[in-house]
């Protein structure tokens, strides 16, 4: 959720300013979200295919070895003299989720940015505030409400996500989420009781999160 929101915040700050072709850039940023999930997942699977995928062709041309990004649980990575084990399939799915759903957060954040009165920023400039100070003390406090909403929504989306992961790799290599497990128990094993029990646990977790939001975050917003 944090990476998704930071990416959307950066994009919203960039396109908020007027520049040539801004409308076209805004439209292109919405493409991942409006693109059908079946088409998006298929394109990613083709690009990441270990045999004929374009990403692996680039890796081979750079002197690397072919990698099955969607079905390899982990991979060894050497960075600054340290050997790291990276959850490869999980990281790939997370990057796909960032790419696909950051336009959703982008729209929320951009709308809030455009609603902030320009007089605040102008007054800060007159007082000699730097761009960084204006962001931390004027812009960011105005965004806490929408960022908290996005966190709750994204957390809920992650728990309920089935189609993206199922189409990418079927939940293989450590990418299985609770909803995939529920579907597997229900359809694959016919274990209706276990599937229903897990679904109830999931619903309770989401209700607790929602109650926390309304009790603390939403109450603070109304007080302001």
PLM region spans:
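A structural signal for multi-pass alpha-helical bundles of membrane permease subunits
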Residues: 1-224
